Structure formats: structure tokens, C-alpha cells
């Protein structure tokens, strides 16, 4: 599951699940994230999941890297644990003033506009994260 656990500065550790970005690895990251969060482990003050990593930040006045690493290494995650996924429908406007690359796609794919939109709208997309990044 976790390929490597290393320190990230003085008060955080870095759980590395590998370099690939896919739903399987991401679900392992999220399951570990949720398990640690639910356990409410003393000293852990922040959890930051990404596509294939989890950062566990902790309070050095309460705990240390060695203790948190041992806890993380020994956490049991149920493979059958269900993730709290939601299916969202996001409205999309495909007016020609917004679909600036449609002509290029028509030529490249040898499809007309309607065929391209049909392919696009008949596909489900997996969203790894939502939110905003500062900057």
C-alpha cells in the first residue's frame, strides 16, 4: 500500500503511494486519510491528501515523527471500506464562443462538432479533488 514514509520538515510525515495517478491509488490515499481522521489521534493536527500522497502534520509538543510513523504503519484499513463518493452533474456551455478548440478537434479527430459533443457528454469523469488553490 504505502511505498515509503518519510519526514517532511520537523512536524510532518509524507506517505508516498507511488508516482502513478489513478483511481485505485487515490482511493487508498483517501481511505488512509479517512481512517486516520476518524481515529482522532492525539497530536495529529492536519491531514492533506493528494492524488497519490498523504501528508500527516503533527504537534511536536505532543508527539514526534517516530510515534506517528509507527501509528501510520500499523493502521488497518479495510479493503471493503466504501468511499463517500458523490455523482455530480456539472452544466457545460458548448457555445462556439466558449469551445475555442472545436475546429482543431474536428480536423484532428475527423469528427463533426455534434459527434465530438456526443462523445464528451456520454462519458463520466472522475474528479480527484474540488476546491481552490491560493495564488
Regions found by a protein language model. Name each.
Residues 1-135:
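Conserved "landmark" site that anchors the functional core of diverse proteins
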Amino acid at each position: 500500500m504505502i511505498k515509503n514514509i518519510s519526514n517532511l520538515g520537523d512536524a510532518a510525515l509524507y506517505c508516498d503511494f507511488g508516482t502513478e495517478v489513478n483511481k485505485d491509488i487515490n482511493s487508498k490515499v483517501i481511505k488512509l486519510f479517512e481512517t486516520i481522521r476518524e481515529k482522532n489521534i492525539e497530536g495529529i493536527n492536519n491531514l492533506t491528501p493528494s492524488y497519490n500522497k498523504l501528508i500527516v502534520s503533527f504537534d511536536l509538543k505532543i508527539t514526534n515523527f517516530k510515534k506517528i510513523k509507527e501509528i501510520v504503519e500499523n493502521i488497518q484499513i479495510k479493503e471493503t471500506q466504501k468511499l463517500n463518493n458523490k455523482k455530480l452533474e456539472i452544466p457545460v456551455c458548448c457555445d462556439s464562443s466558449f469551445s475555442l478548440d472545436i475546429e482543431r478537434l474536428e480536423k484532428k479527430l475527423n469528427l463533426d462538432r455534434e459527434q465530438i459533443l456526443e462523445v464528451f457528454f456520454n462519458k463520466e469523469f472522475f474528479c480527484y479533488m474540488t476546491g481552490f488553490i491560493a495564488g
